[in-house]
UniProtKB/Swiss-Prot annotation:
It catalyses: RNA(n) + a ribonucleoside 5'-triphosphate = RNA(n+1) + diphosphate. Residues 1-246 are annotated as: Alpha N-terminal domain (alpha-NTD). One of its GO terms (molecular function) is protein dimerization activity. CDD domains: RNAP_alpha_NTD. InterPro entries: DNA-dir_RNA_pol_insert (IPR011262), DNA-dir_RNA_pol_RpoA/D/Rpb3 (IPR011263), DNA-dir_RpoA (IPR011773), RBP11-like (IPR036603), RNAP_asu_C (IPR011260), RNApol_insert_sf (IPR036643). Belongs to the RNA polymerase alpha chain family. GO terms for biological process: DNA-templated transcription. GO terms for cellular component: cytoplasm; DNA-directed RNA polymerase complex. The keyword Transcription applies. This is DNA-directed RNA polymerase subunit alpha. Residues 262-333 are annotated as: Alpha C-terminal domain (alpha-CTD).
Length: 333
């Protein structure tokens, strides 16, 4: 295989805003590779990066999303919309797959924001947008709400999250006695914007070469270097399956395929499983025929010649073999 020019990957310092908004450059790429790589990375960045988001809430004395709450300006639906925008710093050392994380708001503050959200079981969890307004309390009673988070990627509708609540209700550990769990949509994408730019570059090469610029802005939950690395790893994992043709079983980045039950071969079936008469079974066993595979070596003439097998017994055996879609040769004419 003809070798390609070694490429370089770097951050464009002049276009850097912070860890969560910057631009990366890859060059030199052979003609066409800029668009190919850029499009694949962009789609993966927008759809397949892991993060942690809310999937359910529980408000004291609230049973459905159409309720209103005494002294609270916002209705329940508006509160749910606000909660969806709570962003947590995603740290793989803190958050585990298939685990539920409970946040609690209990305050008499007039302006209730995401900074009022506390994690009793996981105090190390950090909130990105602490000034996000959740609700307005015009009364003296405390506003009490629990928010439940989990790890995932892509998008999950509130209907699917309803099912998740039913499955995980025992793990939610709610301390609110009056009120019901309400599901909300989960948009896991930590990316706000991805812009891909491809242009030709002047070089000493005789071939036309390109540079690829990828501008990324996240929601502040994961830094841009990490999500770009994660996107590349996802693509590599898929392409490795194609490239590593001789060692497909060694690729373990995908979920394990459920093992299908393998039916035993009919050749290994014991003759006692054929539901034959005792006379027929004994006659066959005396001649050393204990498996269906043994019988399949015989012709009909051989079967007739077996000692103590009468005409009816032979017909019985032939009929049973037909149930296994097996027929014996008739023998020499």
């Amino acid at each position: 295989m003809k070798k390609m020019v070694q490429i370089k990957y770097k951050e464009v310092k002049t276009k850097r805003v912070n860890d969560y908004e910057t631009t990366f450059k890859i060059e030199p790429l052979e003609r066409g590779f800029g668009s190919t790589i850029g499009t694949a990375l962009r789609r993966t960045l927008l759809s397949s990066i892991t993060s942690v988001v809310p999937f359910a809430i529980k408000i004291k004395d609230v049973d459905q999303e159409f309720d209103t709450i005494s002294d609270i300006v916002e209705d329940v639906q508006m509160i749910m919309l606000n909660v969806k925008n709570i962003h947590l710093v995603y740290d793989e050392n803190i958050f585990e797959d298939n685990k539920i994380y409970r946040g609690v708001i209990e305050t008499k503050n007039e302006k209730i924001t995401s900074s009022d959200l506390k994690f009793p079981e996981n105090p190390e969890i950090e909130i990105v947008n602490k000034d996000l307004e959740i609700a307005t309390n015009n009364g003296q009673k405390p506003f009490v709400m629990e928010v439940y988070f989990h790890v995932g990627r892509g998008y999950i509708s509130f209907e699917d999250n309803k099912k998740l609540i039913e499955e995980k209700v025992a793990l939610l550990n709610s301390t609110i006695k009056r009120g019901k769990f309400l599901a909300i949509d989960s948009d896991f994408s930590p990316v706000e914007k991805v812009k891909v730019k491809v242009q030709e570059i002047n070089s000493s090469s005789l071939n036309i070469e390109e540079e690829l610029e990828i501008e990324i802005k996240t929601k502040g939950t994961i830094d841009t270097k990490n999500i770009l690395s994660q996107a590349a790893q996802i693509l590599i994992a898929h392409l490795q399956v194609i490239g590593d043709v001789k060692n497909l079983d060694a690729v373990d980045v995908f979920e394990q395929k459920k093992q299908e039950k393998v039916e035993p071969s009919i050749h290994s079936v014991d003759i006692t499983s054929l539901d034959l008469s005792v006379r027929s079974i004994n006659a066959l066993k005396r001649q050393g025929y204990t498996k269906l595979a043994d019988i399949l070596t015989l012709t009909e003439d051989d079967l007739v010649a077996v000692k103590n097998l009468g005409k009816k017994s032979v017909e019985e055996i032939i009929q049973k073999l037909k149930e296994y879609n097996v027929t014996l040769n008739r023998g020499e004419k």
